[in-house]
Every structure is written in structure tokens, then in C-alpha cells.
Amino acid sequence: PVITTASDAVGISALDQLGWPIEGDVAGVGRAMLDGEPIGFLSEGIWPIPALPENVEVDNFGASNQLLVTDRLVDFQEGVAVLRPPSLVVGVGASRGVSADEVLELIDSLLADAQLSIYSVRHLATIDVKADEVGLIEAAKRRGWALHTYPASALAEVSVPNPSERVRAEVGTASVAEAAAIFAGGSLLVGKRKSNRDVSMATGAIARHQPRGRLAIIGLGPGARDLLTPRAKEELRRAAVIVGLDQYVEQIEDLLRPGTRLLATGLGNEEERARSAIVEAKKGYAVALIGSGDAGVYGMASPALEDFDGTFDVVGVPGITAATAAASLLGAPMGHDHCSISLSDLHTPWPIIEQRVKAAAVGDFVVSFYNPRSKGRAWQLDSALVLLAEHRPATTPVGLVRAASRSSESVTLTTLTELITTGTAAVDMFTLVVVGNSSSKFVDGQMVTPRGYDWKS
């Protein structure tokens, strides 16, 4: 059976589905959110959390229900729920043979004394020579934390309040716990402390990881909803801000959480959209930059990452490309070496495009032409086809696929000579042109390129 919850019915995810641990009056605040009651929202820093509905109001301290985002311990009262951000890094130094119990007792003590939540621990950090320390590995495993290790040369460059010359002599850095916490996290909250044992074998320190924005660059595929990947859907739901071409934003708007901020612009302006996404990610928000097909293929990934400075996290979400969608409709035209070439000279001068077409022709590649023809650019496709015809048979199969996977989808099969002769007036920017190689042929209405250059008998 399919079980539908109240949150599913109104399109608002339950609080425990926001991606982070949550404590307190989760049920009460969750009901208030669904009922549209005012909820105050207070976050220590801008964290990349998904969008929240409009009744969740920033700094509305008078509301009877409150949603907090903090790594600090708080008194849980009725009407207060607390999201735990992954903000804390625990640096650990250890002697050979330390037990997991000793490590965890130390960590729990450090957190409790500093009034910090165990649920906000992002990972453990230590020096790389301790990467095989069983006690550290087991401690991290028990709590579900990652164990990150760093070389002594990196830790030695970190300024710490409690350096030790004895430690420097042993491992090449004057600090392990504090230096690893600071190197991995940011600002030191809790200085180095030893475990409370007769013979102490562990030291620990805690740093707070500064909030970082998150940019998901998402390929929406060729257009059909069933060709949008599950990962893309998850990332769209995770975003608080969506940036994209207006028609693409409209295409996926029903998948978004209520309260998602939409930054939609018209055709063109790719660089402006990329800049907008980066600005929002640098502020600390969870941002999704969307485009058709795969974002890394003639898509938004390139302008977004061209000047990436490492100040926010980036996630790439692959999508089904126009070429692969077209190929599935044509048969198996890309069964051997193939390439894609854009015929738009908006960003690439025609002489360079022409050079690439000639190379593909000489190399006998199957060629997919993107952006083949527009109202203001009508001759490039014809020229490219003539160049290919100089190096492959007149009967070479050609497939024209327009609006693959959409309601206006159409597929036309022809040959290289026939297309050159009859003209390309029917081709537009929504069409992908696939030209076979010298061994491609039609097989009962399917365009096929064999894996080898000789057909099997």
C-alpha cells in the first residue's frame, strides 16, 4: 500500500525530512507548520537547508512555536524544535593502542562541558599517521562519523594556543588535536584536553565549521518527467533557491518545496544566471542551478564553475543528454566512436567549428550536431554536411530528432546526400542531427552503427 502523510498531501516535508537531526517538540512544531500557524525561525548562521513554508518567519520571537538551527544544547520546551547543523569538528590525538571507549568518553565530556550537541559533530580529524589507529576508526564507526586525516606538514602550519615540542619531535607538528580541528573546521571552540584516565592515551579539541553554501548544478534531461533522474528530484527538493531559464523553472516548479525562492530569467543570460547562483551560494543558501539535458554538456556547469573559488560546496547532478535521448529513438547510431559538435557560432568562431567538423569527418566519427540551425543562422548545417560528405558514402544514414521525449517529438530518417539535396529548412534549434559513420546503416527502420567496422555475417 502507498501511505500518504499529511505533509505529503500539502507538499510540505516533515521536519525530520529536512536532512539533519532534529530534537525537541518535533510533532508539535510539525503540526503547526502543516496548519499554517506562525513559527519563529532562528538560525545561528545561514545554513544550506531546504526551503521552508511562508509561515516559518525569520526572527519571529513572539510565535508560540519556534524552529531553531544551532549546535548548542538548549532547554527543550513545548513548541520548540531544534535542527542540528553539521557544524562541529572534533580533533583527536591518540597514543598507539588507544581504545574506542576512551576516545568516545573524551569526546562526550568535551561536548557536554561546552554545552554542544553530539548531533552536530560533522567528523573527527587527526594526523595521517593515525589513519590506521584501530581505536579511532572504531570510535568513528560507532557514531557514524567520518575520520579525516591530514599530513603533519599541513597541521604544522596551523597556529594553536597549546603547542607541544614533545609532540613536534614525535610526529612533526606541535599539535594534533587542536591543529586538526582548526584545519578541518575553522574556529577553535574547545582547546586541547586529555582523557580522564590514569594513563591518558587521547587528547581532543573542538572547532566550529563555518556555514558553507551549497550549489547543486542539475541536468533536467530532455524534458519528459520520467527521464528526470531520482537524484535530480532529491536535489530540487533540497534547494532553498532555484536559478534557471524561466521555461525550465516552470517545468519542475511542482516538485519544489513550498517557500522555495525562484530566480528565473529569459532566454540567453547564461552568465547572469550562473553569477546569481554563485552569489546565493556564497551567502550560505542551498541553491540549485538548473538546465536541460546534462548540465556539463553545453550547459550551466561551465559558466558556474569557470571562476569557482572554493568558498561553497558544489554538487553535480547528471542528466540524460539530448544526444542519448535522440539515439534511443533512432536505434543504435552511437554504437562506435562518436562526438558532439555545436554549430552555434555565438561563443565559438565558425573557422574553429569548421576545423572540428573536418577532424570528425576524417576520423570517421558518428557526429551529433547540437544547435544546428536557427532563423539568424541558416547555412552552417549545410556546410557541415558537405564537409562530412567528402569522407563518407552518400548513403550514410542521418537521423533528425526534434523535441525528444516531449509531446511534439518527431523522428526523421534520411541519408546524407538526400538531406543535402532537399535542404535543411525543417531543422531548428530543437532538433538534434545525428550523422552516421562510414559503416552505419539502416536495419529495418533502425539507424545502427556496429561496434566493429565490419558487419558480422
Residue ranges of predicted features:
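C-terminal edge-of-domain segments
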Residues: 66-75, 82-83, 178-211, 426-440, ...
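N-terminal glycine-rich phosphate/adenylate-binding segment common to multiple enzyme folds
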Residues: 1-60, 163-212, 286-308
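Short glycine-rich anion-binding loops that position phosphate/pyrophosphate groups of nucleotides
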Residues: 7, 72-75, 95-96, 193-198, ...
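Class I SAM-dependent methyltransferase SAM-binding "motif I" and its flanking Rossmann-like core
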Residues: 4-7, 224, 296-366
